[in-house]
């Protein structure tokens, strides 16, 4: 599965909300990212505090049916942790089901949401 389109937004309320609003515009797999997210949110409706210019906010849109969608947050956590270790030598820990910690501090939060379309 390869990414068909990546969109950069200088500022965005929420990358997840943007993808949900523009979902039909993406091909099978698309992505959007920003360095300034002004209305981020986490699981259970919690807010996600923005660190403008010091973080990357990224959402992937997958239009392909997933055999086991409930495993996506776990797989995403493992994939991001693996890439941080391989590419940057960052050895972080997974706080199941959706956070990555470095020295006890959260450095990644993963939020997976479904969208009905078609």
Per-range role (PLM):
Residues 102-103, 118:
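Short secondary-structure boundary/hinge segments and terminal tails
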Residues 94-96, 101-102, 111:
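Glycine- and Gly-Pro-enriched alpha-helical subdomains that act as flexible
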Residues 1-89, 106-109, 113-116:
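N-terminal lobe of the biotin/lipoate ligase/transferase fold
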């Amino acid at each position: 599965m390869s990414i068909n389109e990546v969109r950069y937004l200088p500022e965005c309320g929420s990358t997840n909300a943007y993808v949900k609003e523009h979902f039909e515009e993406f091909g099978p797999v698309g992505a959007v990212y920003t360095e300034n997210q002004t209305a981020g949110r986490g699981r259970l409706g919690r807010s996600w505090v923005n660190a403008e210019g010091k973080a990357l906010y990224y959402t992937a849109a997958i239009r392909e049916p997933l055999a086991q969608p409930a495993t996506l947050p776990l797989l995403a956590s493992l994939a991001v942790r693996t890439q941080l270790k391989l590419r940057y030598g960052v050895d972080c820990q997974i706080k199941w089901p959706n956070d990555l910690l470095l020295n006890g501090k959260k450095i990644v939060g993963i939020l997976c949401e479904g969208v009905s379309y078609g």
